[in-house]
Amino acid sequence: MHQDSTRRRRTDRGFTLIELLIVVTIIGIIAALAIPNLKNAMDRAKQKATMTNMRSIGNALELYSIDHNTYPRGLSDANSSVLTAMVAPLYMRTVPPGDAWDNPWHIDTNATGTQYTITSYGRDGASGSNSGGATTDINCDIIYSNSAFYQWPGGAQQ
């Protein structure tokens, strides 16, 4: 009788190795499914934050043009520090130093000060094709020009 109660207590304690392996496998499968979706959601959030910052910079340039009757003239691939000297703090408190991926802005204006373009090279940080319109490429350049997006992320990103 004493042996029966000892054997029962030993079998009632804890999980078996097989049960633990099954649980670890299930957690691994869930993680494998969730991580790519989480990364995609984070990239989409960075795209939206970048677009919001581009609109804010564009608004500052519009306010600058109201006071000066022109956008800043002749900027070529300028970054945020060049623009900060022109628009902060009067038109914008601070110019974001770069896009949501920490890549620098590429800001251009024409020689007459009638057009501006703000470009983010996107997730990959490299200049890509600029076909215009919505694009499903997660690495696409985002281009904002004269208060409108010329190229932007749209739809399911790949």
Locations of the language-model features?
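Extracellular/periplasmic head regions of type IV pilus-like filament subunits
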Residues: 59-117, 158
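Gly/Ser/Thr-rich helix-start
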Residues: 15, 29, 70, 103, ...
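Short, solvent-exposed loop/turn and secondary-structure capping segments
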Residues: 50, 67, 129-131
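Short, surface-exposed interaction loops/tails
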Residues: 2-4, 109-158
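N-terminal membrane-insertion helices
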Residues: 50-61
